[in-house]
């Protein structure tokens, strides 16, 4: 009799837990919106608006929230080096995530980031090898190669799982957002900090409000995106493919 009661109690507890999870999951929303890019030198809207990061942080006084679905911390994240380029060009992760840097080129690379965000230097490593980097602090990490100056990427570590990156048409989707009050923030590589800060605002996600609307971002080509090597010096120009002298 006692055993039967214990079984019933366990079943009731399982039902309560399951119903709580389902109920919480039903409160999650797919938050959508759109980004438009404008050139600071011209009022004309850009045709494409990719790689704009939009994320949501719990507003002051709002209860803390957790996404039930898997976060980027549990995923295998990679920034591949191939054809003297990083793929993808932009990677957004949660703080605490690890990113793999495999070398798929038939020659050496030297990946480093010494300016903002996570600071590291992987040194020279050959084709077919790979290294992991743990992004344990919030911020934007600009990734370069000490051998090939044309290689660059960005890893952005956020203290929230609720983020999305715009596609080529400017569409943004942030999945699994629980209902509540949030602060919306935005980042774009060619926008000034003041321009980005002006777009930040508080939003409320509810059954009737699942869109943050249209964000109009002004980008500027005046921002200097050039960089030095890991020693703070200019890159050595590559040797010419043809000899400088002529045959007699």
Predicted regions and their residues:
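Bacterial N-terminal signal peptides that target proteins for export
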Residues: 2-12
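Bacterial N-terminal signal peptides
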Residues: 11-20
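Sec/Tat signal peptide C-region and signal peptidase I cleavage site
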Residues: 22-26
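Extracytoplasmic copper-binding redox domains, predominantly the cupredoxin/blue-copper superfamily
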Residues: 27-248
């Amino acid at each position: 009799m006692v055993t039967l009661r214990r079984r019933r109690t366990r079943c009731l507890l399982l039902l309560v837990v399951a119903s709580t999870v389902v109920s919480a999951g039903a409160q999650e929303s797919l938050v959508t919106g759109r980004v438009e890019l404008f050139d600071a030198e011209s009022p004309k809207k850009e045709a494409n608006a990719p790689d704009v990061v939009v994320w949501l942080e719990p507003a002051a006084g709002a209860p803390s929230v957790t996404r039930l679905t898997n976060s980027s911390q549990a995923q295998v994240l990679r920034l591949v080096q191939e054809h003297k380029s990083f793929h993808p060009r932009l990677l957004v992760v949660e703080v605490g995530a690890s990113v793999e840097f495999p070398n798929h080129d038939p020659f050496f690379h030297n990946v480093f980031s010494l300016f903002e965000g996570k600071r590291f230097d992987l040194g020279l490593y050959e084709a077919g090898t790979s290294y992991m980097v743990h992004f344990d602090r919030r911020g934007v990490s600009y990734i370069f190669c000490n051998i090939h100056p044309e290689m660059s990427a960005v890893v952005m570590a956020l203290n929230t799982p609720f983020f999305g990156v715009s596609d080529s048409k400017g569409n943004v989707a942030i999945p699994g957002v629980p209902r509540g009050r949030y602060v919306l923030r935005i980042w774009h590589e060619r926008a000034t900090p003041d321009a980005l800060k002006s777009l930040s605002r508080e939003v409320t996600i509810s059954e009737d409000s699942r869109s943050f609307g249209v964000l109009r971002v002004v980008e500027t080509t005046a921002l200097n995106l050039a960089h030095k090597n890991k020693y703070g010096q200019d890159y050595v120009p590559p040797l010419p493919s043809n000899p400088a002298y002529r045959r007699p």
